[in-house]
Amino acid sequence: MKIVVPGGNGFIGSHICRLAVNAGHEVVAFGRSGEPDLLPVRHPWVGKVTWRTADVFDVDAWSDALDGADAVIHTIGTITQDPDNGVTFDRINGEAAMVAAEAAADAGVDAFVKLSVQSKPPGVSGRFLASMRRAEREIPARLPSLRTVFVQPNLVFGDDRFGTPTMAGVLQSIGRLVPFEYGSYHGRPLPVQLVAATAVQAATTATLRGALGVDQIDGIGRTSGLVEIDDLPEPTLRPLLAGIGSAALTYWTLKRLRRTSA
């Protein structure tokens, strides 16, 4: 099958591309920065992907990639806004997906898979989730020819992103003490490999459609045959967190814990 991946050079997108080409699919990926900064010697799959430099809103720059394509896996999204530079929840999480879906439908593509989220992340505006859900309602309603699937994990972690497994561990640990969606079993963090495998399965399996939450992603990813289950990373509580985002999220969870305990 031929799969087109908008945002394929990102964290989850690159894992999707890797699993898809290793499974024998033809993959074309594009993003504003083009090919990911990965050494082909260490990541031989990179050379099997056709990389394009394009903005999703400039359809003329990438629509030819849809020729003969069977599926689109849309991985573009944001949890922060920068309105001065055109980065808003509605534009990036909603309009970008609609643009890609319309182009896919016009090209006769069968399936449109969109990465989304099951619940609102801690400390993030409710407009983030609202923009996701709006796109998930409008795409199947306006483009019924597409088989649409929305892959909805919560926190996604992987060994190749330092600090992310730590944050997953913090949320999982806090969730045992103070119940909230991201720390519960049904809202648990998932390894990026399972999310990527589910996205590939969603693109290539005609019976999959609609929203796939954390439990379904876990099950589909583990039975996909695309990942080595024994090699999956586990979220851990490490002493050092990386990045301002992780520190801010940790501060938020600890404040929540103190308020609940008071």
Question: Where are each of the predicted segments found?
Answer:
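Alpha-helical substrate-binding/gating segment
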Residues: 175, 189-229
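Hydrophobic alpha-helical topogenic segments used for membrane insertion/localization
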Residues: 233-258
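Substrate-positioning beta->alpha
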Residues: 92, 96-97, 163, 183-202
